[in-house]
């Protein structure tokens, strides 16, 4: 990898700053707000795909034999390529309600908004779009969680709705390993999870539920590659498999 331009890795260094507020403005109501900033120096990233004489020399030095029919060999390696900064806000709240014989419900909400930025690039040749995108785009710009936890005697239930904001990832072309680059885009999506359980004894609980109850999938990948084996983008924050239903039992000692 040194022949292709790689250098010995240095440790990443980070500096975190946060400030928070906590309040209980009413009985059974709790609120919190946190602001944070995370700076990472010498962040380790992938170099992206490199080609040319340096790439060919690196492959040969590794002990591999290049097929003479191959005209465009590529290599990639890990490197301390960038400095980054993440700024965000976390807000949360919970409220408890008592409906008497009808049971109790604890309502909770959580919200996050964040922005990632590359503040310095030390990678020789700079960053291509496919190397920069995982750092600044591949996590949701915001996320909202609403949850209701129900308790009534031996019965319990939980309903959760999670809204993921826009998520994107720019990838290299599946045929060239570089340009033209393609940006896979996942629109804001709400995922609903539901579970109901019953305490058979003081130790045994039986439950049934669903993850991703509404069977939501991310937008299909633009560049699917490998004979369209990758239909959905793997960076989806809520997975690619759709709904999952289950029955389970748990025993505590």
PLM feature spans:
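Outer-membrane beta-barrel strand-turn architecture
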Residues: 13, 23-27, 39, 85, ...
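Generic long, charged, amphipathic alpha-helical segments
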Residues: 158-163, 170-191, 195
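Solvent-exposed loop/turn elements at secondary-structure boundaries
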Residues: 1-12, 17, 27-35, 39
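Residues that define the transmembrane beta-barrel architecture of outer-membrane proteins
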Residues: 3, 13-17, 85-89, 140-144, ...
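Gram-negative outer-membrane beta-barrel transporters
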Residues: 29-30, 35-173
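Extracellular loop and loop/strand-boundary signature of outer-membrane beta-barrel proteins
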Residues: 4-7, 75-80, 129-135, 177-184, ...
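C-terminal beta-signal and adjacent terminal beta-strands/loops
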Residues: 115, 161-173, 198-253
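Residues on the lipid-exposed face of transmembrane beta-strands in outer-membrane beta-barrel proteins
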Residues: 19-23, 91-95, 109, 146-150, ...
